[in-house]
Amino acid sequence: MDKYDVISTIGKGSFGLVKLIKRRSDGRTLVWKEMNYSRMSAREKQQLVSEVNILRELNHPNIVRYYDRIVDRKEATVYIIMEYCSGGDVGRMIKECKKSKEYITEEVIWKIFAQVVSALVECHSHKGGKVLHRDIKPANIFID
């Protein structure tokens, strides 16, 4: 954890927190997904381990890049360090468009759709099709 400086919390969900961080060695901006596993069932812990292992193996331009993971056994917390997508997520994009009474252009919609399909094809063909996302929603589609 001494390799990173926390900048701010940028997300919160049932899984835990997402924090914007800066890697000390090169100043690169990344994020970490912070998950406390102390109250997880054995099955949930296994899913967490599987998620980390899958992220480590996936390498595709439309899948958020995995960099590292830190396990803090004392705090029962796992930190998954990943690429930062500065454009936010599609859920936020939709909310902002609704608020300003604007539309997302068809061209942008098709571009995002094609990238999501490309990422899903990669996931579904990885290790004989054993990788399923299980939570595809606008808030989980990030924009760089």
Task: For every predicted segment, state its role.
Residues 7-13, 18:
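Protein kinase glycine-rich loop
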Residues 75-89, 93:
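Conserved short submotifs of the Hanks-type protein kinase catalytic core
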